[in-house]
Amino acid sequence: MKTIHVIGAGIEGQEGFSRRALEIVEHADILIGRAGQLALFPDFKGETLVIEANLAPVVECLAAAKGAAVVLASGDPLFFGIGRYLLRNLPDAELEFVPNVSSVQYAFAKIREPWDDAVFVSAQGRGMKGTVDQVVAHDKIAILTDAVNTPSAIATELIERGRDGYTAYLCENLG
């Protein structure tokens, strides 16, 4: 049975990968990731595939792959990442995950705040209402945003609901 390694890229570029992760990449026949992640491995000799918004070509490529395949992900692939999509669309026995520090872990470290009591929500590609409902319901929350559901849009929605007095940290471009 083939193994597809899904490796989390860390905050520190190639230096943030474990020795094991780098060895897996070195022996891969195909390397899949976003353009910036692939750029971390300029000397990679195998086939590459750039991940775009549509993930179907990634699954097609992995399903057809005969050699060693690696998917580069951000941080922890199973934390609001590509890992969930791959598990839904490929045999889970073929997938092996090698996580790294997630953007949320890194953000909490930067603001010097324990995060074991936080709630995590992704507003990426989702509606605003559920995200804001979570903010209202919890004392500590980390929100992954996108170009539509921005921190500003979330703050505006909170103010429109008459909710204010929150302490917020905006952490961006974390790696």
Regions found by a protein language model. Name each.
Residues 103-105, 109, 170-175:
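Short, flexible loop segments at boundaries between secondary-structure elements
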Residues 1-106, 124-126, 130:
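Class I S-adenosyl-L-methionine
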Residues 8-9, 73, 117-119, 141-142:
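Short, contiguous strand/loop micro-motifs
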Residues 84, 88, 109, 156, ...:
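Short, well-ordered alpha-helices that flank and scaffold nucleotide-derived cofactor binding pockets
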Residues 90-95, 113-117, 160-166:
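A short alpha->loop->secondary-structure connector
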Residues 2-6, 20-22, 53, 67-69, ...:
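A contiguous loop/helix-start segment that scaffolds small-molecule binding in enzyme catalytic cores
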